[in-house]
Amino acid sequence: MSENSIRLTQYSHGAGCGCKISPKVLETILHSEQAKFVDPNLLVGNETRDDAAVYDLGNGTSVISTTDFFMPIVDNPFDFGRIAATNAISDIFAMGGKPIMAIAILGWPINKLSPEIAREVTEGGRYACRQAGIALAGGHSIDAPEPIFGLAVTGIVPTERVKKNSTAQAGCKLFLTKPLGIGVLTTAEKKSLLKPEHQGLATEVMCRMNIAGASFANIEGVKAMTDVTGFGLLGHLSEMCQGAGVQARVDYEAIPKLPGVEEYIKLGAVPGGTERNFASYGHLMGEMPREVRDLLCDPQTSGGLLLAVMPEAENEVKATAAEFGIELTAIGELVPARGGRAMVEIR
């Protein structure tokens, strides 16, 4: 079988960040009866479901550690490796940090797919690492029933510049650096519904590096930051609100969307992860049409950064984004929490 004819997505039951275990199930898995080990230098653990762990070295610098891997979301091996690596490195940028090295995680069905195809996957990962200015310094591989690839990434950040997902404030405006709809468009492609003019759009977005996050971290008015991945905009925004004790009002029309995404949702191109996300976070939403719900719950792979920004810092954030070719528009705002109101309201 040639590398050009291979369709990697046929060899896995899930795709990209849509492979994630649902938040409700994950909570059961992570629940522990053991006494919590307390380390005062661990600035960010898993209590707030943040993007990465952060450890204070005590010298003004903190280490960021993260890992992310998944099954193919595209058929091309090189693109799969590049997307998986870009997605993993994004967690460092989402914490406001700078990546310094990565190691690869590879699961490969050696009796089904050739090592040459696996090499193309790792080459895609290596390419993304070079884009981020880091080495792919090693890794680990196993014989697995389905192809899996990703990275464990280490980064650094000035301790005072760490950006968490739980430190937003009422009054902050919300910004999203990439359009939604990655799960929808990749599902439309699998269902042979994708129009020629939309071919490759999702791949291009997934391969965009969230490198701007390190620059956003230098802006005092950026109060919180996270990347939007497998739990969709609703999930990651809900976690931001829960961590800060605020509620969100979102302007649906202002949300950046991939071309054709609303049409494909109406045609049924909705990934399975969408329903899992709604089952976990739907009780936090206000009333809205099914099509809106399906987009907000759409699992993103290598999605954009979600920023909570004080109004006085809006112009600086937009100017910084423009330096990276990103045009930002506010998609909503955070307001004080009030009982009896949905955590995320759509206008």
Curated annotation (Swiss-Prot):
Pfam families named in the record: AIRS, AIRS_C
SUPFAM superfamilies in alphabetical order: PurM C-terminal domain-like, PurM N-terminal domain-like
Keyword line: ATP-binding, Kinase, Magnesium, Metal-binding, Nucleotide-binding, Selenium, Transferase
Impact upon substituting residue 91 to A: Complete loss of activity
Note accompanying the cofactor annotation: Binds 1 Mg(2+) ion per monomer.
Effect of substituting residue 87 to A: Complete loss of activity
CDD domains per record: SelD
GO CC annotations on file: cytoplasm; cytosol
GO BP terms in the entry: selenocysteine biosynthetic process; tRNA seleno-modification
Binding site for ATP: 20, 48-50, 68, 91, 139-141
Similarity remark: Belongs to the selenophosphate synthase 1 family. Class I subfamily.
Protein's name in the database: Selenide, water dikinase
Species name: Escherichia coli (strain K12)
Phylogenetic lineage: Bacteria, Pseudomonadati, Pseudomonadota, Gammaproteobacteria, Enterobacterales
Gene it is expressed from: selD
